Amino acid sequence: MDPNCSCATGGSCTCANSCTCKACKCASCKKSCCSCCPVGCAKCAQGCICKGASDKCSCCA
């Protein structure tokens, strides 16, 4: 559990624009909370599924 995120590892969460997640490990996370997505990723805000670094992110590949 990320102390700065209200979701468990592998779970799902919907972060507000002011999301403070620093190491979000959610299976699915909305908004720009996921560190795997580069800044400005339009698809990430629609519901990115993070699986690793930016080059492995399903929404930005």
Curated annotation (Swiss-Prot):
Transmembrane segments: none annotated. A divalent metal cation 4 binds at residues 33-34, 44, 48. PROSITE patterns: METALLOTHIONEIN_VRT (PS00203). A divalent metal cation 1 binds at residues 5, 7, 21, 24. The modification N-acetylmethionine is found at residue 1. A divalent metal cation 5 binds at residues 34, 36-37, 50. A divalent metal cation 2 binds at residues 7, 13, 15, 26. A divalent metal cation 3 binds at residues 15, 19, 24, 29. Residues 1-29 are annotated as: Beta. SUPFAM superfamilies: Metallothionein. Residues 30-61 are annotated as: Alpha. GO terms for cellular component: cytoplasm; nucleus. Belongs to the metallothionein superfamily. Type 1 family. Metallothioneins have a high content of cysteine residues that bind various heavy metals; these proteins are transcriptionally regulated by both heavy metals and glucocorticoids. This isoform may play a role in regulating the transport, accumulation, and compartmentation of zinc in the hippocampus. Class I metallothioneins contain 2 metal-binding domains: four divalent ions are chelated within cluster A of the alpha domain and are coordinated via cysteinyl thiolate bridges to 11 cysteine ligands. Cluster B, the corresponding region within the beta domain, can ligate three divalent ions to 9 cysteines. This is Metallothionein-II, hippocampal. It comes from Bos taurus (Bovine).
